[in-house]
Amino acid sequence: MPLVAHNALPTFERLRRDGITVLSTERAANQEIRELHVGLLNMMPDAALEATERQFYRLVGESNPIAQFYMHPFTLETLPRGDKARAHIGRHYEKFEDIRAAGLDALIITGANVSHANLADEAFWQPLIEVIDWAWDNVTSTLCSCLATHAVMQFRYAQTRVLQPRKIWGVFEHRVTDVRHPLVADVNTRFDVPHSRWNDVSRAQFEAAGVKVLVESEEAGVHLAVSGDGLRTVFFQGHPEYDTVSLLKEYKRDLLLATTGALAEPPFPRRYFDRKAQAFLAEFARRTRVGETLVFPEAEVVPLLDNTWHDTAEAVIGNWIGCVYQVTHRERGLPFMPGVDPDNPLGLA
């Protein structure tokens, strides 16, 4: 939780200049440490639906040991679902109409599978835009993950994602580009993030839209950016929520499809498998190519995987939650407390 500058100690102002959150006594008096209501618009396909829930719930739940979080999952009815997923959604998810009536403090929008080059041609496009429009006016901050970032950049800023010659896939090194922004305050200035995407929105596109880049990679491009107001829309292109095994499961899926001829044999995700893991996987691929029926060597590979991103992901989500707490209204459903400028809610210079 943030410091309160309850006297004129110069250290408070120095910490502010260094990007550390320090509240004035006036702002602190207007803060109420209440439960936070966080929506999760889960657009992921059936196979990843529940895993995505767990990943984002874990990040939010671990972000602050004091706050209490009420998570509100929902989805879009236009997304194709099988019987099992529909049953899960029917039992455990909420309707957007009910969420809209009750209000949210923060919203996370996941990625989704697509079948069209132009996102506006997807069946989920108009329902997604309805959620995005509502959130802009009624939610303190919306965090967009991967494809959701591309959708918002296209819809709100007329910046269309660009298909890349090869998939941006693996674990990539990133650097913080503005250490003073509260979203990246006190996180490692160099850290890893997994990526898994064919399309990209470039730094030039973000900047043309007035969106500030906060974290980027020389190889994978921009990971973290924020709308020009500093908080109301947060953009991820990477997948910091991924479990240690997430990229392995993607590789397994694609490699098994390759054995049937449905896909070309996939490359290894960058900077993810060590040499021993690569040897296990290469041997499996070689032997299945010549017709052997083998069990995928998951049990041998999993112990060899390292997670080099989760602690920083927790820190960034913790900063985001902290920023929301500072400015959200005491009344659920109103985005900002009195006196907060929606065009500069964090009071950034």
From Swiss-Prot:
The keyword Cell inner membrane is annotated on this UniProt entry: no
Pfam families (UniProt xref): HTS
A GO biological process held by the record: methionine biosynthetic process
Enzyme class: transferase
Residues at the site labelled Important for substrate specificity: 196
Molecular function terms, GO-annotated: homoserine O-acetyltransferase activity; homoserine O-succinyltransferase activity
Site annotation Important for acyl-CoA specificity: residues: 113, 147
Positions of substrate binding: 167, 196, 253
Keyword Heme: no
Top-level taxonomic group: Bacteria
Pathway note: Amino-acid biosynthesis; L-methionine biosynthesis via de novo pathway; O-succinyl-L-homoserine from L-homoserine: step 1/1
Gene3D superfamilies, alphabetized: 3.40.50.880
Major site of localization recorded for this protein: cytoplasm
Compartment annotation: Cytoplasm
Active site per UniProt: 146 (acyl-thioester intermediate), 239 (proton acceptor), 241
Keywords recorded for this protein, A-Z: Acyltransferase, Amino-acid biosynthesis, Cytoplasm, Methionine biosynthesis, Transferase
Gene Ontology CC entries for this record: cytoplasm
SUPFAM superfamilies reported in the protein's UniProt record: Class I glutamine amidotransferase-like
Substrates-to-products reaction catalysed: L-homoserine + succinyl-CoA = O-succinyl-L-homoserine + CoA
E.C. number(s) listed in UniProt: 2.3.1.46
Xref: NCBIfam families: PRK05368.1-3
Family, per entry: Belongs to the MetA family.
Function: Transfers a succinyl group from succinyl-CoA to L-homoserine, forming succinyl-L-homoserine. In vitro, can also use glutaryl-CoA as acyl donor.
Listed name of the protein: Homoserine O-succinyltransferase
Organism: Thiobacillus denitrificans (strain ATCC 25259 / T1)
Gene name as annotated: metAS
